[in-house]
Amino acid sequence: MENLKLITSSRRLMALAALATGVALPPQSIMAASTAQVVQQSGVVKGQVLDPSGEPVIGATVKVKGSKTGTVTDIDGNFSLSAAPGAMVEVSYIGYKTMTVKAGNGPLNVTLEDDNQALSEVVVVGFGTQKKVNLTGAVSVIDSKEIASRPVANATQALQGLVPGLQISSSSGSMDATPNVNVRGTTTIGEGSKGTPLILIDGSEGDLNTINPQDIESVSVLKDAAASSIYGSRAPFGVILVTTKKGKSGKVTVNYNNSFRFSGMIRGKHMMNSVDYAAWVNDAHTNGGSGVFFDQERMDKIVAYHNATPVGPGTRKDANGNLLYGIDSSNGTTWNDGYGFGVDDVDWYDALYKSTAFSQEHNASVSGGNDKFNFYASFNYLHNGGFMKLDKDKNDRYNTAAKIGAQITDWLHLDYSTRWTRTDFQRPATLTNSLYQDLARQGWPVLPLQDRNGYYYSAPSPALGLATAGKDTKERDILNQQVNLLIEPIKNWRTHIDFTYRSENTARHWDKKMLYNHDVAGNPIVYDKGSNVHEDEYKENYYNFQAYTEYNFSLAKKHNFHVMGGFQAEQLRKTEFGLQRDGVLDESRLEVD
């Protein structure tokens, strides 16, 4: 009773605050049961709303169903509502079930019932589950409906903005970069320590970025230090528990959905044109006391080329029909230096980057079952296109998942699941994380992108390397298999036996070809003779076995006990090697034998 009185007092304070500000609390999706009699006097319904302990409910919403006519109860739980005879009256309040009664003859005395549904919701917390009402730690729960409709590339991004205190950030723009996850802000400054939470997928440690977001049934985020009582030193920064979907009793259900997306750069830049750039550089040199960098003759050529109409690579035509070129040759054989003689007008950000990148995703799943057997299977394909213009950059992902559950006997249940993920990543071999900022320093607008023959001009322009130097690829396969046994020989005594095997194979291939300039006649000239092929291999095998038993019982219908004990063992084996061969002999066979 003391607990009930405390709850009533807190609700009364909430209702007083609502009445003081003149704001009516919104009706809630709750039901109530009571005895009701209605007095109809001149179209006015009067009555009182009480809680299960008989205390008045302050601020309960009372309204005529299907209309905007409504009121709230006063400090004594009383109300007066304009309603016609026979009108249906709804009474609702947060934390209680809603009642709908028909206006009759007599006072309306309503006794609400507690809505225990929210408190009975089961949450995955560590080994096993708990009801929300019994939780003492900080836990946030997300269900599949909140995740499925989000157009994201991975499950980590799907959680962004859904969990208070969960911070998700990216430290790199590379397409194979994975987001960083942090639960409680910056928690460590130690070198090599990221302070990331422990991530468990169906009870086994895994990578959140490798699963299909639409395979997720629910996510529980354990935020406080209480998680360390179960997971020890691996969980000081929180735990993210992911439960994937499984089959349900009922007829077979087939789902398919897709999405097509166009992405733009968040802060795409554009360079000033060649005329403005040359003027600014001259002003800077003059202010520094070193005179102008672009003399008058070159300035005139820059202005003329800027005002002319493009008609071909490195070529424009002025109003008089004269052809102008972004770079010339002084000796008739090789092109002049771009910094010293170039008069082109190139926006390097526009030349190297697309304005939009295309992505597409396809999802298909099938599920069904009965009381004895259920199944779930899914397939996902995700293509993420990059922003590079001169060569392909992409990151593709393939996901397949299957899960079956079988009630073998009355006391034995078996679950088996398998999940396979492949990611294919590709980018130009000379693409670096600093390219975008390097363009601001090295990408002068007067530097030519191409000569008049259509060949890419040499460095310091990055175009030649991006278009012709080779590619960097990475292929990653992850296979995850789990077997779960649930043994319940007597009621409320359950024993869980789980085994997980995960294998990962990653192969990276990086080749660097020789770079060729071209002379005025279009003949190739070796610019960079450095060439090599690099191969990396990474293999990982992970084994996890855990067994725990739990027993629930109650005394005097008031004292609930949950006893649990268990054991866990895991093993991780890694193999990693890399090699590189310099001096490519045959560019048609870029491989290491």
Placement of each model-derived feature along the sequence:
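Short secondary-structure capping/turn segments at boundaries of alpha-helices and beta-strands
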Residues: 77, 363-364, 482-484, 503, ...
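Active-site and adjacent substrate-binding regions of carbohydrate-active enzymes
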Residues: 492
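Catalytic cores of large soluble enzymes that bind and process phosphate-bearing ligands
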Residues: 147, 151, 175, 354, ...
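Residue-level signature of outer-membrane beta-barrel architecture
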Residues: 244-246, 368-370, 406-407, 485-487, ...
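Short, Lys/Arg-rich amphipathic segments at extreme N-termini
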Residues: 50, 463-464, 487
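Short, small/polar-rich motifs associated with maturation and membrane association
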Residues: 1-401, 413-415
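Surface-exposed loop/interface segments of Gram-negative outer-membrane beta-barrel transport/assembly proteins
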Residues: 249-344, 382, 386-480, 496-498, ...
